[in-house]
Every structure is written in structure tokens, then in C-alpha cells.
Amino acid sequence: MSQPVYSLKQLADFLNVEFQGNGATLLSGVEEIGEAKAAHVTFLDNEKYAKHLKSSEAGAIILSRTQFQKYRELNKNFLIVSESPSLVFQKCLELFIAPVDSGFPGIHPTAVIHPTAIIEEHVCIEPYVVICQHARIGAACHIGTGSVIGAHSSIGEHSYIYPRVVVRERVSIGKRVIIQPGAIIGSCGFGYVTSAFGQHKHLKHLGTVIIEDDVEIGANTTIDRGRFKHSIVREGSKIDNLVQIAHQVEVGQHSMVVAQAGIAGSTKIGNHVIIGGQAGVTGHICIADHVIMMAQTGVTKSITSPGIYGGAPARPYQEVHRQVAKIRNLPRLEERIASLEKLVQKLEALSEQH
């Protein structure tokens, strides 16, 4: 496979952006700004990497119009964009690094498909996939090797299911959904009743899971089905790897849940919420729209106001910051208290002498 090569001007025309510099510069790859060489395209999005601009050997640097006004005197080859530099860099990434498919077009003969399943046109079903009775696979879907689609479940058109994914029975997956390897959608929730003798009896979970359009679910993430209602991930939300979403949880539109976070049962997460890595959210509470939880936040009660929260139990970031500052000052305060105690002892001794 030959490596594509573009001049700076050709690339600017393709991206429909302005450029500064030598339009004949040849570009054949992408790289981080601190490591880019003469044939590489790179980008500046986070200002903390601006320190690399002056010394960068990159053949082209993508930056915003505001950044260009700030750094134009460096006389580098710049691609000047109106949107996020990272988004434009992504277009370059896909231009220079061609996607690789599995090499198994169509429906592989080792796939086991129940005769009542509905398979729409232009579907790719890789080796050893199992599709159960009355399942529906939408047009232009891709089902990866070893995945299982349960009975009466549906996968919306243009969705991509990577290898070894399990979508259990009666689960609804929307359009353009991406599910990474090892994810399990629709497993039984962790619901038990404890008897008078201390024995735990599992409660059958007969609800289901609804994944709306344009959702992405990371590797080895689990989303449990409801006991009698639905667990729902709303449109456009992104779930990272190794996330646990319990029974009858609702995640609102365009929210993000970062790796190793856990959301306990029957909790409702609002729209545009960000849950940081290793955060834990207790059950039967509500989280307002536009809430950001820092990494390892422990949420024990509902959050009713937008804002940034951290700590355990969760509280507004400003309060956490003040408390951390006070904790850092504890050694100095301890020294001051010790000095004051010595001074008090001296004063008491002098008082006794008189």
C-alpha cells in the first residue's frame, strides 16, 4: 500500500482552509507536535504544547485563526482553521492512514443466523457470529468476529459492532452506534433480596436496554438491563472502556462517562454531563444537566446544579480546592501550634514564679 503524498497547497485545498508558507512542501504523514519532522502534519490545540512551536520541524502545523495571529511571526508552514484544530487534524489522520478492514466481506459461512432473523442490505457479518431468532440487523451494519446478537434485538443501520461483543435479548441499538470489543449490553442487573436467614435470592431482570443513535461504547464496558423497565443511553453519549452502568440507569444526551466509572441502579444522569475516570455514582439519585465530575469523585446524593464537582462525598470544586489547600498547610500549622504551646508553657512558668 503506497503512502499518499500531498503538497501544502493541495492539503489546504482539500481541507478548504487557508495556509501560510511554502505551498510546494510535500507532506506524507502525521505526528505529535514535539516529534514531527519535515514530511509531517501536526496541530496545536492545547496551548501548553505551544512551547514546541518554535523548534518544531513539522512540514505543516494546523492552528486556529486566533493562534495564527499570535504565532505568525515564526514563519512556519501553517494551516489556518476556523473550527477545532484537533477536528481538522483528524481529517488529515484519515487521509494519511488508510483504514484496514478484516478481509471478510459479506456474510461469512461460519456465521450462525437464525432463519427468522432479518438481515438488511450491505451488511458485513464476520466469522463465528451468532444472530438469534427475530433479531434485526440494519443496513450497512458490521458485526465483528464472535459477537452474539440476542433474540428480538435490533441493530440500527450503519452501526459497527467489534469482535466478541454480546448484545443480549430484546436490546435496541440505534443508528451509527459503535461498540468496542468485549462490551456486554443487556446482562442481568445486580439485584437481590436477602432472606431472614441471610440468603441472597437473585431477582430476574426482565427489562431491557435502549442505546440511542450515535452512541459509542468502549471495550469491556457492561450495561445491565432493567429489572422491569429500561436502562437507557441517550443520543450522542460516549462511554469509555471498563465502565459499569447498572440496571435502570438513564444516561442523558451527549454525556461522557470516562474509564472505570460506575453508576449504580436507577440513577438518572442529565444531558451534557461528564463523569471522570474511576468516579462512583450511588443509586436512586439524579444528576443535573451540565455537571462535570472530576476523577475519583464519589457521588452519594443528587446534584441539582450545574458545575464542577470533586471529592468524596462530592462537593463543588471550589470547596474541594480550598480543603486541599488547607490540608497542604497542616504541617505548617502544626509547627505554629507547637511553637505556641512552647510559648504558653514559658508564660505559665513565668506566671508561677511571680
From Swiss-Prot:
What pathway is this protein a component of?
Answer: Bacterial outer membrane biogenesis; LPS lipid A biosynthesis
Its GO CC terms are:
membrane
Question: What is the main EC category here?
Answer: transferase
EC number(s) recorded for this UniProt protein: 2.3.1.191
Q: Catalysed reaction per UniProt?
A: a UDP-3-O-[(3R)-3-hydroxyacyl]-alpha-D-glucosamine + a (3R)-hydroxyacyl-[ACP] = a UDP-2-N,3-O-bis[(3R)-3-hydroxyacyl]-alpha-D-glucosamine + holo-[ACP] + H(+)
Name the GO terms of the biological process aspect: lipid A biosynthetic process
> What are the alphabetically sorted keywords of the record?
Acyltransferase, Lipid A biosynthesis, Lipid biosynthesis, Lipid metabolism, Repeat, Transferase
List the Pfam families: Hexapep, LpxD
Q: Which GO terms describe its molecular function?
A: N-acyltransferase activity
Which residues act catalytically here? Answer: H247 (proton acceptor)
Q: What does this protein do?
A: Catalyzes the N-acylation of UDP-3-O-acylglucosamine using 3-hydroxyacyl-ACP as the acyl donor. Is involved in the biosynthesis of lipid A, a phosphorylated glycolipid that anchors the lipopolysaccharide to the outer membrane of the cell.
Q: Output the NCBIfam families linked to this UniProt entry.
A: lipid_A_lpxD, PRK00892.1
> Assembly and partners?
Homotrimer.
Q: Which family does it belong to?
A: Belongs to the transferase hexapeptide repeat family. LpxD subfamily.
The protein in question is named: UDP-3-O-acylglucosamine N-acyltransferase
Instruction: Provide the gene name from the record.
Output: lpxD
